[in-house]
């Protein structure tokens, strides 16, 4: 048997090729318009992803305002995640309540790890404004300007940042938000060198276990772009890898403690769990879509004639 894979740059072109019978599957979650136009098709299938979108805050010291915990907490509280998903990225994604996404790992009692470790990441404009005012006073400032960096080649990134800018500025008097869009490659480079204030990042799990996400933010991790160091977080993560490595339930408790440390100190800002849907020819059988690792497995796939 033979699998023909075509690289189609434009998502709308791929969808049209699918409808014309030139392709057997096509992603419909690339843009809101494509998703809305096709989400009710009988050919829609889930294409699971263990991917979380989140904001990194530069805590290295080069951005004075973001070294203040209350400022970061205020930004988190001023983030309307449900609003972002609905208004900016209506492509099947869901508001995030943790670093680890739904569908990555299921515990022995059937609980999703993401639900088990989730924290109270809620939108609270009043509390956000209060903490922001207190943070400004601690900094000796009356106003601050923060720049959000994101990918220029992703429509969803532009829509998300626009929405965040609007809500942050509406909720937090004294805050001005600027936007900076760069290529994916440049965004990664800027992240690695702390050439950012706030940066929109995405991470997809490599394997179905919590450490594929919680390894990101240890003090010595190359992916800890914000350069924060949290002893409680580090200890919880190390316990999951060592003492509790053979006890999934205990490791889940460790990951929950790690998530709480992130939440309490607002070291990052979870936005949404990315979900992808696709159109797939109903005659295609045995095609396996995984959330981690080999995302599309053709091993047992065949076309029913």
Predicted regions and their residues:
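Extracytoplasmic/peripheral linker and loop segments enriched in polar/acidic and small residues
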Residues: 85, 174-187, 214-281, 305
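Long beta-strand-rich cores associated with HINT superfamily self-processing modules
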Residues: 278-305
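Ligand-binding "clamshell"
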Residues: 35-48, 195, 209-224, 281-285
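Alpha-helical secondary-structure segments
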Residues: 2, 51-98, 144-155, 245-264
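Structural transition elements
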Residues: 95-134, 155-157, 246
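Short helices/loops that flank or line small-molecule/ion binding pockets
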Residues: 12-23, 36-40, 69-70, 162-170, ...
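Extracellular/periplasmic solute-recognition and catalytic clefts
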Residues: 4-63, 86-87
